[in-house]
């Protein structure tokens, strides 16, 4: 299965220009709140009409402004899980699931499909309960069951963990991960959480103010986000302004030091990104050594955060150090930190 999207939609403050393809796998749409991620899903589902463009699913045109094609949602074969799950409050779990089988006219077949989905989603004992009687995780499973029973060609999840308490997220995330891995089709996950995107999806699309900044395999996007905005959205703490010297070398502005990169330095490179965990203490003459002065140390349950500045205090970077135990002592403040050439990401913008 494959999805092709190339649409425009004018929104408050910017114009959404979503152009991407998604194959038979799980793909994350990563971006800040209000960047157009959820609107993109609504356009694919047929809930919102784009101003112009084209949406094609498995060779079947769902929307084409030039050809005046705009299939209604019920004809698109799209399953969309809303942030609040959108269960019908006056219907039981079983009745909600049956709503996903309106196209099936045989009563016996409808009952059998509903029973099978109740078993698959571990909802058999909750079939007669109403949404208000369910936990957040149970509500999500019921909403997913209602979607999946209709056998959609594409599954889209809009911030599926946003309505859950933090203690439930890990458990439910594991269930959603299994669902995405086993779904026989295209799956899109909207999130602003880079960790969720990394754990759950093999492919990633990074959006910012309605524009696709970067698309590709998730690990490749994290390793080479290509732009300052995409690096920040993937959680890079250190965006260090630089001046390119040659195709593999840059000078860090404010640090009086040069860095050698494994990736080629592109035209228009204005900064390098180095993730906070990728630094190690080193000697002054080590490759890619950066002179630093630690000015702040804070402790998390599983790591230490050190904020360092250049010797003259004109620039700043973050260093994260993993802890071997909860009682591990803080690391000694370094005089120099270095990063391997493979860990240094050239960035535009």
Predicted segments, located by residue:
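ABC nucleotide-binding domain signature
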Residues: 28, 70-72, 76-86, 188
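Non-catalytic connector elements of ABC transporters
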Residues: 5-26, 30-32, 38-39, 46-49, ...
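The short alpha-helix immediately C-terminal to the Walker A/P-loop
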Residues: 42-43, 203
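ABC ATPase nucleotide-binding domain helices that frame the ATP-binding cleft
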Residues: 38-41, 141-142
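C-terminal boundary and immediately downstream tail of ABC-type ATPase nucleotide-binding domains
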Residues: 223-246, 273
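A position-specific signal in ABC ATPase nucleotide-binding domains
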Residues: 48-49, 56, 102, 181
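ABC ATPase nucleotide-binding domains
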Residues: 77-79, 90-229
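ABC ATPase NBD Q-loop/coupling interface
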Residues: 54-76
């Amino acid at each position: 299965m494959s999805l092709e999207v190339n649409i425009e939609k004018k929104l408050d403050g910017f114009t959404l220009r979503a152009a991407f393809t998604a194959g038979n796998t799980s793909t994350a749409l990563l971006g800040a709140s209000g960047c157009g991620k959820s609107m993109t899903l609504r356009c694919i589902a047929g809930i919102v009409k784009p101003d112009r463009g084209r949406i094609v699913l498995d060779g079947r045109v769902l929307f084409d402004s030039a050809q005046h094609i705009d299939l209604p949602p019920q004809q698109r074969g799209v399953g969309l899980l809303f942030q609040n799950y959108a269960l019908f409050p006056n219907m039981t779990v079983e009745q909600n699931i049956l709503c996903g089988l309106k196209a099936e006219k045989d009563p016996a077949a409808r009952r059998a499909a509903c029973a099978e989905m109740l078993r698959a989603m571990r909802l058999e004992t909750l079939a007669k309960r109403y949404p208000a009687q369910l936990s957040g995780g149970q509500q999500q499973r019921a909403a997913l069951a209602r979607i999946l029973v209709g056998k959609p060609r594409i599954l889209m999840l809009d911030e599926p963990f946003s309505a859950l308490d933090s203690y439930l997220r890990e458990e439910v995330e594991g269930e959603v991960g299994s669902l995405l891995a086993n779904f026989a089709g295209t799956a899109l996950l909207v999130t602003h959480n880079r960790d969720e995107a990394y754990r759950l999806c093999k492919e990633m699309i990074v959006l910012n103010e309605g524009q696709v900044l970067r698309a590709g395999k998730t690990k490749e996007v994290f390793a080479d986000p290509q732009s300052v905005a995409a690096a920040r959205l993937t959680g890079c703490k250190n965006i260090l302004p630089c001046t390119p010297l040659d195709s593999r070398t840059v000078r860090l502005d404010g640090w009086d030091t040069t860095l050698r990169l494994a990736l080629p330095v592109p035209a228009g490179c204005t900064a390098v990104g180095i993730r906070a965990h990728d630094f190690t203490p080193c000697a002054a003459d080590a490759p890619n050594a950066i002179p630093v002065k630690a000015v702040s140390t804070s402790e998390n349950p599983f790591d230490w955060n050190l904020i360092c500045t250049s010797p003259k205090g004109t620039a700043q970077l973050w260093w994260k150090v993993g802890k071997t135990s909860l009682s591990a002592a803080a690391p000694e403040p370094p005089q120099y930190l270095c990063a391997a050439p493979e860990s240094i990401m050239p960035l535009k913008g």
